[in-house]
Regions:
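Short coil/turn segments at secondary-structure boundaries
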Residues: 33-39, 139, 239-246, 323-325
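Non-catalytic beta-sheet/beta-sandwich ligand-binding modules that flank or precede catalytic cores
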Residues: 15, 19-20, 24, 43, ...
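Non-catalytic DNA-recognition/assembly elements of restriction-modification systems
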Residues: 9-31, 213-249
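Structural detector for helix-capping/boundary residues
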Residues: 6-9, 18-23, 52, 130, ...
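Catalytic core of tubulin tyrosine ligase-like
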Residues: 316
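A short beta-sheet element
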Residues: 50-52, 59-130, 250-312, 321-325, ...
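A short glycine-rich beta-alpha junction/loop motif
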Residues: 88, 103-109, 141-164, 288-292, ...
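Amphipathic alpha-helical segments with low aromatic content
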Residues: 1-16, 156, 162-222, 345-383
């Protein structure tokens, strides 16, 4: 293939094939040793780039957690804004653009485009495509060390268009990355808000009132045992059932679908009996749960979403009854003390957190959709 399947309007003609190492400078990083002797808090120290400094989302290294003394410079590799660095671990193998000056250890490769043959954003995206990763894997096949190195990366073949088309492609993917980052940050902010509000809208430290309430509610909350709030029921084995459309849940979430329901019309909260015991989640009827997952059905005058908030506020790990695999019993769950208001206040609190969860889910779904779209476009806008 000499041109990609998807192109911007106005661009045609074949892409040019190049041996990558003949078009850029590729060098391995280095580490002064022992490295601990060179780490410094001095503001005049040199930025020391580690894997942990790379963002989970985005392509730019903008800061480092550590610095090294300038004396270590002769034993390392200096990098500058506009340089690309690539982790030499093939399981990682993701490129980043330096936005700051710094130094890299021998777990990084420096890629410097001195002759400006590439648009920087295009080059960063190209180095992370599945097409490039496939070349890395093929060249490393049979090697005893499954890592990237200067020779391997330099021997790859790349196919590139004009600088103008590169710039268009690079800018397009940069905007997609910005959108993903935006939705991811919104997700994180809402998750932090939810954690904060779970503390503020439920009584803490023996108090009989929460710090934050809806207008019009002033009465004290009443102390209850969870046994007064929910009916904790046991999951059961599903292997005797036929395939169907009733979801089966375990401690990790959805597993498969079967022909019968354990709960036909009562929504509940799933809480692990064994294994993952600190990840409660809402179960919508009809459903089936396996024997390692209890399902707690709210009793009359108790709102499901409010009760879910109670479950999220409990430190379930502290109630682990096993020295091996984490475990809970019905008796332990039933004995937990909690506080509840009247039903109308429960309903409003539950609705508030349900809306928050919905917003978090929407932003996460948007992130997933954008990542899938980006993956498709990377496969079709590069060769």
């Amino acid at each position: 293939m000499k041109s990609p399947k998807i192109r911007f309007k106005g661009f045609d003609g074949d892409w040019e094939q190049r041996k990558f190492g003949e078009t850029v400078i590729i060098e391995r990083g280095g580490s002064p040793r022992p490295i601990d002797a060179f780490i410094t808090d001095d503001e005049n120290g040199l930025n020391w780039v580690k894997i942990g400094d790379a963002p989970e989302q985005g392509n730019y290294i903008t800061k480092t957690a550590e610095k090294i003394r300038p004396e270590g410079l002769k034993k390392t590799r200096e990098v500058h804004p506009g340089d690309l660095i690539l982790s030499n671990s093939m399981s990682f193998g993701r490129p980043y653009i330096m936005a700051i000056d710094g130094c890299i250890h021998d777990g990084w490769l420096l890629i410097r485009d001195e002759e400006k043959r590439y648009d920087l954003k295009f080059l960063c995206q190209m180095l992370g495509t599945e097409q490039m990763l496939a070349q890395y894997r093929a060249m490393a096949a049979g090697s005893t060390v499954n890592n990237l190195n200067k020779e391997l990366v330099g021997n790859t073949e790349v196919k590139v268009p004009s600088i103008a088309e590169q710039a268009k492609i690079g800018e397009y993917f940069s905007k997609v990355d910005d959108l993903i980052t935006l939705h991811q940050k919104k997700c994180e902010q809402l998750t932090i808000l939810k954690k904060y509000m779970l503390q503020k809208m439920f009584p803490q430290n023996g108090s009989d009132k929460p710090e934050i309430r809806f207008e019009g509610f002033t009465d004290d909350w009443e102390q209850r045992k969870l046994s007064d709030v929910v009916d904790v029921r046991s999951g059961r084995d599903y292997k005797h059932l036929e395939e169907g459309d009733i979801p089966v849940y375990g401690t990790g979430g959805y597993m498969l679908s079967v022909s019968e329901a354990l709960s036909d019309d009562e929504d509940a909260i799933g809480i692990g009996r064994k294994g993952t015991i600190d990840n409660p989640y809402i179960l919508r009827a009809p459903f089936w749960t396996v024997d390692t997952l209890f399902y707690a059905v709210p009793r009359e005058k108790h709102d499901l979403n409010f009760v879910y908030g109670i479950f999220q506020n409990i430190n379930w790990k502290a109630k682990d009854e096993s020295t091996g695999v984490p475990s809970l019993s019905k008796a332990t769950i039933n004995a937990v003390s909690t506080m509840t208001p009247d039903y109308e206040e429960q309903r409003l609190i539950g609705e508030y957190f349900s809306n928050l969860d919905h917003l978090i889910t929407l932003h996460q779904q948007k992130c997933d959709e954008l990542r899938n779209a980006k993956k498709f476009m990377l496969q079709n806008m590069f060769i």
